[in-house]
Design a protein with these regions (language model features):
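Mid-domain alpha/beta scaffold segments of enzyme catalytic cores
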Residues: 1-5, 9-136, 144
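Mid-to-C-terminal alpha-helical segments outside catalytic/metal-binding sites
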Residues: 2-7, 13-65, 93, 209, ...
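Short beta-strand segments
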Residues: 6, 67-69, 107, 213-215, ...
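Short aromatic-enriched loop/helix-cap "lid" or pocket-rim segments at secondary-structure transitions
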Residues: 15-20, 79, 117-118, 172-175, ...
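Flexible, glycine- and charge-enriched loops at secondary-structure boundaries
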Residues: 44, 81-88, 184, 188, ...
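Short glycine-enriched loops at secondary-structure junctions
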Residues: 110-111, 164-169, 272-273
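Catalytic pocket-lining loop regions of alpha/beta-barrel enzymes
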Residues: 124-260, 264-266, 309
Length: 311
């Protein structure tokens, strides 16, 4: 089978690690322990962020290109601009030094994003599109407020990745288990962002924008029957709205495909936190999810690297 494109991975370049270690308030690193505002301290495996080792792992999984993004749950984008900008600059400079196997999602601060700088990033073939935290897109009005950066991505012909953002500590009891933010908080964010896109008429606002929601949009599409039951208007499947496979397996993804069809599903592993999906629903569906659909999402501008080229 042809080499796959994984549209959702994470890797921390050295400069970003240094910036996180220099901070004294969340998000910050002490040695390899990550501290964020809303989640328990997390022991980071440094080998998971070794670029050459990652390339080898991806090749073993048949992945020829990995699209990496700044970990939005860190909350970097939502920091005051003076704090957000250095972290985001470190991210962009760091990914520019990665092997050709990696492409990157650009990021911008929530406050006063540099639109000209974003245009320049999206004109660089190393960047496949723009990532926005779902926490920035929770309501119809939030999508409208994000219009300036969304319009830049649309004009560039590049997609937008909607990724879970930080989970606020203020909304959690102290005794919730460690898995709570990822299982409850992240999925709630994605569900809100999915339905906010539909409620605002996202396709009307951005006729040519391609959008991909991480983690199957928190399974929001599966609630389409409830949406109609409660007064929502049924809509045809939008061929330019995608969901990735991260965090779910055959049972959940089967339900999503029954609503959106196979063409909406793209390979996104969330590596290093999970492995790329190797097979789903037979050979033809697997090829669509791992090869054809990701290329369509990315505008066919990314062709998976041959192994000898990608290293």
């Amino acid at each position: 089978m042809a080499h796959a494109t994984d549209v959702h991975q994470h890797i921390w370049p050295e400069e970003l690690v240094d910036r996180l270690r220099a901070r004294t308030r969340p998000p910050y690193l002490r040695e390899w322990v990550l501290h964020t505002e809303g989640e328990p301290p997390y022991d980071v495996d440094p080998t998971a962020h070794d670029a050459r080792a990652r390339v080898a792992l991806d090749h073993e999984a048949g992945v020829g290109t990995a699209c990496v993004s700044l970990s939005a749950p860190l909350g970097s984008e939502a920091l005051p601009r003076r704090d957000a900008a250095p972290l985001i600059r470190a991210w962009h400079r760091g990914v520019a030094e990665l092997p050709a196997h990696f492409k990157a999602w650009a990021s911008v601060p929530v406050t006063d994003p540099d639109l000209d700088g974003l245009r320049a990033l999206l004109a660089d073939p190393r960047h496949v599109g723009l990532q926005l935290p779902a926490t920035q897109l929770l309501t119809p009005g939030a999508w409208e407020r994000a219009a300036p950066v969304l319009a830049v991505a649309e004009a560039a012909g590049t997609p937008v990745l909607v990724h879970p953002g930080p989970v606020p500590r203020s909304g959690l009891d102290r005794d919730v288990p460690g898995w709570w933010p990822a299982v409850v908080g992240y999925t709630a964010q994605l569900t809100s962002a999915w339905w906010a896109w539909h409620a605002v008429g996202g396709r009307r606002l951005f006729p040519r924008l391609r959008v991909v929601f991480a983690a199957a949009a928190g399974l929001a599409p599966v609630h389409h029957e409830r949406h109609v039951l409660r007064g929502g208007q049924g809509e045809p499947v939008d061929p330019d709205v995608f969901v990735d496979t991260s965090g779910y397996g055959p049972q959940a993804l089967d339900a999503v495909v029954r609503v959106l069809g196979i063409d909406a599903l793209v390979l996104g592993s969330d590596r290093p936190y999970a492995e790329p999906l190797a097979e789903l629903f037979g050979e033809a569906a697997t090829r669509a999810i791992r090869v054809t659909n990701p290329q369509r999402l990315l505008g066919a501008t990314v062709v998976p690297q041959r192994q000898e080229e990608a290293a």
